[in-house]
């Protein structure tokens, strides 16, 4: 069908023989005024473009609950860190003795700079490669993933680790089957990847937002880890920290405090991650709906999206994050019980907990995946979490397989290339230490920590771009499923390309929850 048959915008495309609308009660025809009111309106102010229906403060009780959780975590951190500080000399100050102390001399400064520069350069090259040859990028990533899984399977068979070998063989065969049966969808995924990267280049604030999020998450993860150790120091009955002010010690108190610390840590981490996701989704939403409007797009979309995520929509963020945090906490307990069962020789109970852990892990993945799209609705339309969840259910009901395949293709490739960057930087760091031979590594004891540090840091650098691409892809898919006529009107050539590779773009989802 010729692409010249598009009707005049702003109506949806009307190709003969194509189903156009998935009507979800109430239907579009009876609610056009209210339906189109959901779309962001042109304005110079982000708050005016992305208006929120009353009540503006969505899901506010969960904001209160989150703030109480943060206050409790801060209180426990203050007590336990004080105990850790006062017993620091008894705990030991380093893994290594004084003769092996790792000092920041010129050599290490150059090494850190070298790691960061190489990681950034390789990450940029990967993005350039993905933009220039998206189909080859995705196909290569998927094939390499299959080869890597097959190689791991063969290694485990050679090592006579048959249980792991069979698991990897099953997953590798399943991955190969998915690739072969769904390979015709790669062109659509490639087009979406192109568009997402182009928007990322147009809005550098997406990368800045992700970078800030990585730093904040890293700092909190460090604090979280230290508080866990400090909790043992303060409340373990056999610890020297029992004599420090802040309450007595007992096994029950230790377990109770640890439960809260783990819950609070998971909860706060989830909230941080989702605030960043909503902020980036708001930037992509600005581009999708308003970049080509006559009045222009709002100024400072990143700041406006972040402000809304931290105010009107923060309760919705806390609501969805709470669900994931509870699942994570339960799964952590199950993993502890599993380890204790196997450690005590009770293999029957251990297998039961192993199966339960797998089920909880699958549920955790489903909820995270669901939340990822639900928060796109929160970012774009300012709805409460439950209303966004119902819209997400409609999206998954009608286009869930399309979204899942698209995400799997792109994310698998991105994660594989990210791991490649980590391997390359870690190898270069090893050669750097080997050939410069710094004094602190004269005995070779710092190869492992420096190489591990290089791998982690380079991976974090690459994750900055990956987080943006992942959020951008999901936001674009949500907006395209809900309002394809907007993209048809503002990006006609791109829309034609998407239609050729993905005719289901005409199957518009309309809902009013």
From Swiss-Prot:
Places the protein is found: Cell membrane
Coiled-coil residues: none
Biased composition (Pro residues): 1-13
Gene Ontology cellular component terms for the protein in this record: plasma membrane
Transmembrane segments: 61-81, 109-129, 137-157, 164-182, 211-231, 252-272, 310-330, 347-367, 413-433, 461-481
Topology of the protein relative to the lipid bilayer: Multi-pass membrane protein
Keywords linked to the UniProt accession: Cell membrane, Glycoprotein, Membrane, Transmembrane, Transmembrane helix, Transport
Pfam families assigned: Choline_transpo
Sugar-modified residues: 97, 441
Chain intervals for the UniProt region annotation (Disordered): 1-41
Source organism, top-level taxon: Eukaryota
Extracellular side: 82-108, 158-163, 232-251, 331-346, 434-460
InterPro entries noted in UniProt: Choline_transptr-like
Gene Ontology molecular-function annotations: transmembrane transporter activity
UniProt topological domain (Cytoplasmic) ranges: 1-60, 130-136, 183-210, 273-309, 368-412, 482-513
Keyword Metal-binding among record annotations: no
Chief location category: membrane
Statement: the UniProt record of this protein carries the keyword GTP-binding: no
Biological function: Probably involved in transport through the plasma membrane.
Record family assignment: Belongs to the CTL (choline transporter-like) family.
Protein name: Protein PNS1
Organism, as annotated: Debaryomyces hansenii (strain ATCC 36239 / CBS 767 / BCRC 21394 / JCM 1990 / NBRC 0083 / IGC 2968) (Yeast)
């Amino acid at each position: 069908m010729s692409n010249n048959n598009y009707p005049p915008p702003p109506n949806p495309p009307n190709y003969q023989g194509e189903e156009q609308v998935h009507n979800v009660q109430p239907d579009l025809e009876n609610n056009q005024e209210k339906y189109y009111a959901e779309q962001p309106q042109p304005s110079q102010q982000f708050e005016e473009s992305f208006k929120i229906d009353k009540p503006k403060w969505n899901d506010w009780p969960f904001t209160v609950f989150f703030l109480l959780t943060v206050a409790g975590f801060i209180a426990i951190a203050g007590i336990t860190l004080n105990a850790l500080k006062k017993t620091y000399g008894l705990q030991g100050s380093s893994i290594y003795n004084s003769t092996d102390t790792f000092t920041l001399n010129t050599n290490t400064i150059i090494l850190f700079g070298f790691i960061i520069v190489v990681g950034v350069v390789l990450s940029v090259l990967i993005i350039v490669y993905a933009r220039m040859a998206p189909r080859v990028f995705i196909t290569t990533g998927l094939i390499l993933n299959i080869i890597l899984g097959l190689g791991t399977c063969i290694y485990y068979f050679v090592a006579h680790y048959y249980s792991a070998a069979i698991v990897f063989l099953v997953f590798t065969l399943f991955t190969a089957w998915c690739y072969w049966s769904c390979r015709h969808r790669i062109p659509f995924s490639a087009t979406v990847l192109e568009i997402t990267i182009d928007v990322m280049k147009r809005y550098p604030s997406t990368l800045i937002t992700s970078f800030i999020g990585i730093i904040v998450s890293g700092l909190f993860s460090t604090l979280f880890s230290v508080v866990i150790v400090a909790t043992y120091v303060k409340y373990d009955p056999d610890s020297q920290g029992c004599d420090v002010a802040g309450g007595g010690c007992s096994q029950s108190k230790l377990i109770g405090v640890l439960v809260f610390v783990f819950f609070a840590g998971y909860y706060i981490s989830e909230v941080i991650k989702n605030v960043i996701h909503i902020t980036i989704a708001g930037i992509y939403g600005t581009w999708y709906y308003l970049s080509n409007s006559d009045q222009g797009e709002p100024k400072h979309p990143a700041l406006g999206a972040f402000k809304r995520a931290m105010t009107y929509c923060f309760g919705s963020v806390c609501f969805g994050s709470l669900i994931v945090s509870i699942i994570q906490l339960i799964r952590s307990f199950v993993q502890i019980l599993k380890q204790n069962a196997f450690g005590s020789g009770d293999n029957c109970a251990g297998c039961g907990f192993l199966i339960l852990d797998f089920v909880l892990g699958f549920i955790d993945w489903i909820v995270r995946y669901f939340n990822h799209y639900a928060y796109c609705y929160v970012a774009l339309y300012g709805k409460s979490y439950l209303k966004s969840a119902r819209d997400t259910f409609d999206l998954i009901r009608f286009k869930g397989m399309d979204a899942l395949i698209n995400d799997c293709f792109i994310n698998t490739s991105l994660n594989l290339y990210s791991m490649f960057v980590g391997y390359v930087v870690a190898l270069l760091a090893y050669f750097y230490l080997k050939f410069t031979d710094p004094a602190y590594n004269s005995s070779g004891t710092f190869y492992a920590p420096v190489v591990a540090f290089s791998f982690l840091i380079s991976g974090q650098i690459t994750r900055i771009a990956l987080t943006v691409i992942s959020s951008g892809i999901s936001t674009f898919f949500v907006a395209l499923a809900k309002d394809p006529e907007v993209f048809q009107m503002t990006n006609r050539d791109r829309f034609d390309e998407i239609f050729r590779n993905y005719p289901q773009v005409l199957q518009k989802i309309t809902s009013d929850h």
